[in-house]
């Protein structure tokens, strides 16, 4: 086949034959195809003629059997005539559309800024409400429940069981104070309603001055709610920041639950966590009093089951929320919110009770507790809400004693002489800034009173002698006046609950409004009268004291300034005694 391309004779003969064949084919086609079809396929035939001319090329010997091909093409066209008719009609329309689009493209395009196009508002299904929507609602912070500090009411007027009234009277509790009235009215109503409606009752946050009776405010309703229980399970947990508070709270629950089968347990760090966990598993208590760290350890070891918990009390909440030991808050709350199949087990939502004398309203801190339907109760005459709520007892009288910086060198002597001149020789609590300062002041006062008033007994308490046995003995001796003056630090300020304290003296200024409130709150407890004195030496200390007391609520009362004439208070003989005591103290320290 390819050899024919290079044979001139073959090329000439083939070209002549192809011309004759093409003429015969055209004649045959005219006879076969009718006139109507011929008109419709003129364009197709013209293309075929061009193909036949191309076949005359001497170099192209590929097209043989042209007769067969032509017959196939004619049959193809005849068969799909309707398709070709539609094609012919669409060609002019396509040209028209192309011309219109080209003219539109030539039109000027309007320039637009580079900005997002406006979008329609997304539809909202108001029927779908988040189950956590209450966490975002902080209206309860702006609408607290205020209670007057002067309110009082006999316990016999509350709807509580006879055994509770009997136990209260045995401990000489006959009248409820303001915070107890406010909280008991709410909790007792919730408890009564919950017996028929086991729904979420709502959490309670309480801001009341230290010493106002917060422990009784939550312990009485808890005992009332649990005393008829049948199966012992962990139903109430009370969290406090220190060991002394654990002992005090536990003692209150034990006294109030006399005559019932309720079991009260305190978690202690001086006992093996494993042994303590085994006891709890074998004999579940009804009420647990603990520090957050110890409780988290038991939760991690799964020795405490929280499925039956009804009450979670956080006492001294401001201090506990500032602690991040073992991330206790997140661990505890996540354990309470564990997934439970309610088809198989009914889980009660525990009611959270938050108490503090310096309650924070910082939503960032409070949100970690994940409140449900919270209510804020403030025991204060001043109906004002600030970021930190600080209140002192209404029965407290506050004083400030100010001197120039030059007199700071005889500060211990001024204190000793003022106590002697004003007959404040017992039930006096003095606060210093550090362990070293408390020990030094205690020793110096012992030496001075040994020469000025020999019958005085002075002691100190701080983190260096804060073991349970030593601490218990010191506080007991102080409450029975075997110790006349006690020098302490801020670290243990919240653990002292002695009703007999009449005077608190801030020998060193507190670091914040919160510490000031907790210091002076050691007196004027349970609506008894009390006095707080603050020593300021120099303009700097006076300015700082003015700043920290500006945020403290005290009703209509003000801080009185005590005017003292040093020439009348201190004589030359007193200064000689003071210098001798300083020399004696230095010998004790360095020898």
Swiss-Prot record:
Cited InterPro entries: DEAD/DEAH_box_helicase_dom (IPR011545), DEAD_box_RNA_helicase (IPR050079), Helicase_ATP-bd (IPR014001), Helicase_C-like (IPR001650), P-loop_NTPase (IPR027417), RNA-helicase_DEAD-box_CS (IPR000629)
A Gene Ontology BP annotation from the UniProt entry: maturation of LSU-rRNA from tricistronic rRNA transcript (SSU-rRNA, 5.8S rRNA, LSU-rRNA)
Residue ranges, annotated region (Disordered): 1-70
GO MF annotation, one: RNA binding
Domain Helicase ATP-binding: 195-377
Binding site for ATP: 208-215
Keywords assigned: ATP-binding, Helicase, Hydrolase, Nucleotide-binding, Nucleus, Ribosome biogenesis, RNA-binding, rRNA processing
Gene3D superfamilies (alphabetical): P-loop containing nucleotide triphosphate hydrolases (3.40.50.300)
Gene Ontology, cellular component aspect: cytosol; nucleolus; preribosome, large subunit precursor
Domain Helicase C-terminal intervals: 414-570
Enzyme class: hydrolase
Residue numbers covered by motif Q motif: 153-181
Family membership: Belongs to the DEAD box helicase family. DDX51/DBP6 subfamily.
Protein task: ATP-binding RNA helicase involved in the biogenesis of 60S ribosomal subunits and is required for the normal formation of 25S and 5.8S rRNAs.
Entry-linked PANTHER family: ATP-DEPENDENT RNA HELICASE DBPA, ATP-DEPENDENT RNA HELICASE RHLE-RELATED
Protein name per its UniProtKB record: ATP-dependent RNA helicase DBP6
Record organism: Scheffersomyces stipitis (strain ATCC 58785 / CBS 6054 / NBRC 10063 / NRRL Y-11545)
């Amino acid at each position: 086949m390819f050899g024919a391309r290079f044979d001139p004779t073959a090329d000439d003969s083939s070209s002549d034959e192809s011309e004759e064949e093409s003429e015969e084919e055209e004649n045959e086609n005219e006879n076969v195809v009718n006139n109507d079809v011929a008109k419709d396929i003129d364009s197709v035939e013209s293309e075929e003629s061009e193909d036949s001319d191309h076949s005359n090329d001497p170099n192209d010997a590929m097209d043989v059997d042209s007769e067969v091909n032509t017959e196939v093409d004619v049959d193809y066209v005849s068969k799909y005539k309707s398709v070709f008719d539609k094609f012919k009609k669409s060609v002019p329309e396509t040209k028209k559309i192309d011309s219109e689009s080209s003219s539109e493209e030539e039109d000027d395009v309007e320039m637009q800024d580079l900005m997002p196009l406006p979008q329609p508002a997304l539809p909202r299904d108001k029927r779908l409400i988040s189950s956590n929507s209450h966490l975002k609602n902080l209206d309860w912070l702006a609408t607290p429940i205020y209670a007057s500090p002067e309110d009082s009411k006999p316990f016999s007027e509350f709807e509580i069981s006879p055994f509770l009234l009997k136990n209260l009277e045995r401990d000489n509790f006959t009248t409820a104070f303001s915070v107890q009235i406010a909280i008991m009215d709410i909790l007792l109503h919730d408890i009564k309603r919950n017996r028929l409606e086991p729904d979420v009752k709502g959490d309670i946050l309480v801001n009341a001055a230290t010493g106002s009776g917060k422990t009784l405010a939550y312990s009485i309703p808890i005992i009332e709610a649990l005393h008829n229980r049948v199966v012992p399970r962990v139903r109430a947990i009370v969290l406090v920041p220190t060991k002394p508070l654990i002992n005090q709270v536990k003692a209150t629950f034990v006294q109030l639950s006399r005559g019932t089968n309720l079991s009260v347990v305190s978690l202690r760090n001086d006992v093996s966590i494993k042994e303590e966990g085994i006891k709890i598993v074998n004999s579940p208590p009804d009420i647990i009093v603990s520090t957050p760290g110890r409780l988290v350890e038991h939760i991690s070891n799964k020795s405490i089951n929280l499925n039956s918990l009804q009450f979670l009390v956080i006492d001294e909440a401001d201090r506990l929320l500032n602690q991040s030991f073992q991330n206790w808050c997140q661990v505890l709350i996540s354990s309470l919110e564990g997934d439970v199949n309610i088809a198989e087990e009914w889980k009660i939502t525990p009611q959270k009770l938050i108490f503090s004398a310096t309650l924070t309203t910082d939503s960032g801190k409070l949100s970690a507790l994940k409140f449900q339907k919270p209510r804020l109760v403030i025991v204060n005459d001043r109906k004002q809400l600030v970021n930190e709520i600080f209140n002192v007892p209404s029965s407290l009288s506050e004083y400030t004693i100010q001197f120039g910086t030059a007199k700071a060198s005889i500060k211990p002597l001024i204190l000793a002489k003022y106590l002697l001149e004003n007959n404040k020789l017992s039930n006096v609590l003095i606060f210093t800034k550090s362990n070293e300062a408390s020990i030094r002041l205690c020793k110096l006062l012992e030496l001075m009173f040994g020469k000025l008033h020999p019958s005085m007994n002075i002691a100190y308490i701080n983190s260096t002698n804060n073991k349970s046995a030593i601490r218990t003995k010191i506080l007991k001796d102080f409450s029975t006046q075997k110790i006349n003056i006690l020098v302490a630090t801020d670290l243990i300020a919240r653990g002292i609950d002695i009703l007999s304290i009449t005077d608190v003296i801030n020998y060193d200024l507190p670091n914040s409004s919160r510490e000031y409130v907790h210091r002076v709150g050691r007196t004027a407890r349970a609506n008894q009268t009390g006095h707080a004195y603050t020593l300021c030496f120099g303009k700097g200390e006076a300015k700082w004291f003015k700043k920290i007391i500006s945020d403290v609520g005290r009703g209509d009362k003000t801080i009185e300034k005590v005017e003292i004439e040093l020439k009348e208070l201190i004589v030359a003989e007193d200064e000689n005694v003071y210098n001798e005591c300083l020399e004696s103290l230095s010998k004790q320290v360095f020898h």
